[in-house]
C-alpha cells in the first residue's frame, strides 16, 4: 500500500477545552495503513508548560492529569511546543506524504483547533478532512445501541493509549456496525 494512503492518528491532552486560554500538555501520533494495521508509533511527548498555565486547570483536568502522572511529566519536560511539533513532523515525514491523511482520532475537531492555534505547520501537514471515530459512536448509539454497548473504553486520558483505543474502536465498528471485513 502507498504511503499516500496511510492514516495519521493523533491525540492531544490539554489543560482544558478552550484553545484561546488552554494549552497542549501531551501529544502522540500513530500511523496505520488504510486497513488499520500498525505502521509505526511515533513519539509520545509531554509538552512543557509553566506552572502559571498548569495552575489555571479546572478540577477535572488537575485531578485527571495529576493522577495519571502527566502533570509531573509536563513540569519535568524540557520540550516546548515548537520542539514537540518538529519531532512529530519529522516522524510523520518518514511514513506519510504531507496533505494526504485526514486527521484521525476521537472528537478530533478539538485537537485540530489546538493544532491550528499552537502548531500550525503540523495542522497543515494533514488533509483538511477528518476521520472522527466519534461520528460512528454517535450513529451506533442512535441506530444500533446494541453495537454501541459492545465498546468498553478505559478512558485513560493518556495520548498514546487513547489513540490505540480509537484504532481498536474503529476496527470494532468496521466489523459490527459497517460490517466490513479485511
Curated annotation (Swiss-Prot):
Its main location: cytoplasm. Its EC number is 3.1.15.-. It is an enzyme of class 3 (hydrolase). Residues 7-170 form the Exonuclease domain. GO terms for cellular component: cytoplasm. Transmembrane segments: none annotated. Keywords: Cytoplasm, Exonuclease, Hydrolase, Nuclease. The keyword Zinc does not apply. InterPro entries: Exonuclease_RNaseT/DNA_pol3, Oligoribonuclease, RNaseH-like_sf, RNaseH_sf. The active site is at residue 128. It is found in: Cytoplasm. SUPFAM superfamilies: Ribonuclease H-like. One of its GO terms (molecular function) is 3'-5'-RNA exonuclease activity. Pfam families: RNase_T. GO terms for biological process: DNA metabolic process. It comes from the Bacteria. Belongs to the oligoribonuclease family. 3'-to-5' exoribonuclease specific for small oligoribonucleotides. This is Oligoribonuclease. The lineage of its organism: Bacteria, Pseudomonadati, Pseudomonadota, Gammaproteobacteria, Oceanospirillales. The gene is orn.
Amino acid at each position: 500500500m502507498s504511503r499516500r494512503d496511510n492514516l495519521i492518528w493523533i491525540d492531544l491532552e490539554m489543560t482544558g477545552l478552550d484553545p484561546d486560554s488552554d494549552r497542549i500538555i501531551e501529544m502522540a501520533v500513530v500511523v496505520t495503513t488504510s486497513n488499520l494495521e500498525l505502521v509505526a508509533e511515533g513519539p509520545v511527548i509531554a509538552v512543557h508548560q509553566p506552572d502559571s498555565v498548569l495552575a489555571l486547570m479546572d478540577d477535572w483536568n488537575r485531578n485527571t492529569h495529576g493522577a495519571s502522572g502527566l502533570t509531573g511529566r509536563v513540569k519535568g519536560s524540557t520540550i516546548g511546543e515548537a520542539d514537540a511539533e518538529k519531532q512529530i513532523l519529522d516522524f510523520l515525514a518518514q511514513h506519510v506524504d504531507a496533505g494526504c491523511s485526514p486527521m484521525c482520532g476521537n472528537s478530533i475537531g478539538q485537537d485540530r483547533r489546538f493544532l491550528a492555534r499552537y502548531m500550525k505547520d503540523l495542522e497543515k501537514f494533514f488533509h483538511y478532512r477528518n476521520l472522527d471515530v466519534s461520528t460512528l459512536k454517535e450513529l451506533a448509539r442512535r441506530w444500533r445501541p446494541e453495537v454501541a454497548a459492545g465498546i468498553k473504553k478505559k478512558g485513560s486520558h493518556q495520548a498514546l493509549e487513547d489513540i490505540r483505543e480509537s484504532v481498536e474502536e474503529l476496527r470494532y465498528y468496521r466489523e459490527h456496525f459497517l460490517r466490513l471485513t479485511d
